[in-house]
A protein has these predicted regions:
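N-terminal amphipathic/basic-hydrophobic helices that include classical n-h-c signal peptides
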Residues: 1-19
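Accessory terminal helices/loops
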Residues: 8-12, 170-180, 189-275
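Conserved beta-strand hairpin/beta-sheet module of binuclear metal-dependent hydrolase folds
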Residues: 15-64, 120, 135-152
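Active-site HxH/HxHxD metal-binding segment of metal-dependent hydrolases
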Residues: 31-33, 45, 53-125, 211
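Divalent metal-coordination and catalytic microenvironments
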Residues: 39, 50, 73, 109, ...
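Active-site metal-binding loops of divalent metal-dependent hydrolases
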Residues: 51-53, 74, 99-100, 130-131, ...
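Active-site-flanking alpha-helical
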Residues: 80-81, 85, 136-137, 154, ...
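Active-site-adjacent loop/tail segments of enzyme domains
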Residues: 153-179
Length: 275
């Protein structure tokens, strides 16, 4: 999980339904701040991403079995509902990275692999950092990135190093700007406070923060975001920007050698940050 990386608040909103092309995309609130993502095709077939809790998924699907389940990493708030879903629909394929801590997987995926699931096509991207085996799924104009990238933030490093995590984020940032980013937690408001501490003079960030406050006040999700928006606002994707580097160096108290060092300083700063 994100382990408290952002403001935690009970999610009260109804599931979000948006459209990407001809496909409805739905986020189901779970626990305090998780999102489980559903993608439906025009035949009503559904892809389920990171079902940490089976209950909202069972309620959303009714009697229709999922076409497949995609898992990004092994944390319980992402895989905890898989067993109950398989008990209901035992033939459901479960795609997951190579990691013994995901025993429910029926199909292991590797970096660069291209998946054809129904009419959908996704590429598997290895993005170590939050965990060593974390993957993301990119395709259909969408990015299911688990706990690697959040809106205005990123996941904590439980098993990776700053160079690994920074490289993973840079890899995601290089995808097309109109890619819709489907993060697994509603952390945006808390992340915004830190982002503004790092880069208070960023006008795109000010605009995004105002939008986020309106959405959360209305009980609405702040996701999906886009990669273009994150590149303009998210300090963890802006380690080469002079203002972000300067803020990190001021916090560290010394010059930083490269983007990975800037990232590591930002992540450590965020870990101990109090508004």
């Amino acid at each position: 999980d994100g382990r408290g990386d952002g403001m935690v608040g009970i999610l009260r909103e109804s599931p979000l339904l948006v459209t990407t092309g001809q496909m409805p995309l739905q986020c189901l609130p779970a626990f305090e701040d998780n999102y489980i993502w559903l993608l439906r095709d025009d035949c009503g077939r559904t892809l389920v991403v990171d079902p940490g809790d089976a209950s909202p998924v069972l309620a959303a699907l009714g009697d229709a079995p999922p076409l497949a389940i995609l898992l990004t990493h092994h944390h319980g708030d992402h895989i905890g509902g898989v067993a109950a879903l398989l008990a209901r629909w035992p033939d459901t394929p479960v795609f997951a990275p190579h990691d013994d801590r995901i025993p429910q997987a029926t199909r292991r995926v590797a970096d660069g692999e291209r998946l054809a699931i129904g009419d959908w096509h996704f590429e598997v991207l290895a993005v170590p950092g939050h965990t060593r085996s974390h993957v993301a799924y990119h395709g259909e104009g969408l990015l299911f990135c688990g706990d690697t990238l959040f809106s205005l933030g990123c996941g904590r490093m439980f098993e990776g190093t700053p160079p690994q995590m920074q490289a993973s984020l840079a890899r995601l940032a290089a995808l097309p700007g109109d890619t819709r980013v489907c993060c697994a937690h509603e952390y945006t408001l808390g992340n915004a406070v830190f982002a503004q501490a790092v880069e208070p003079g960023n006008p795109a960030l000010r605009e995004r923060v105002a939008e986020v406050r309106v959405l959360r006040a209305a009980g609405r999700p702040t996701l999906p975001t886009t990669l273009a928006e994150e590149r303009a606002c998210n300090p963890f994707l802006r380690c080469d920007v002079p203002a972000v580097r300067a803020a990190a160096e001021a916090h560290a108290g010394h010059p930083l050698a490269d983007a990975a060092a800037v990232f590591g300083t930002l992540r450590a700063w965020k870990d101990g940050f109090r508004a």
